[in-house]
Amino acid sequence: VDVVFETEKKVTVEEVNAALKEGADGHVLCYTEEPLVSSDYIGTSQSSTVDALLTRVMGGNQVKIISWYDNEMGYSTRLAETTLMVAEKL
């Protein structure tokens, strides 16, 4: 996933990554500072893993974030969790 957005205030790569790291729960969203490639994420159950080494800030307020995922496994895992949640409500 390649996300680019503008912030209201100036930020640094370190600030962006700190916020992403804090927000990553390790279950749905992960965060890594390891130099991995797309094939390293095959079979991961997380919906997305933020690649902190690829975070960029341009002009102080334009931020680019890259995250990786295994579409089949991540989706299947979320679907199974949703099914269990619905079943518990019945």
Where do the PLM segments sit?
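C-terminal substrate-binding/catalytic lobe of Rossmann-fold NAD(P)-dependent oxidoreductases
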Residues: V1-V63
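NAD(P)-dependent Rossmann-like dehydrogenase/reductase catalytic/cofactor-binding core
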Residues: S45-L90
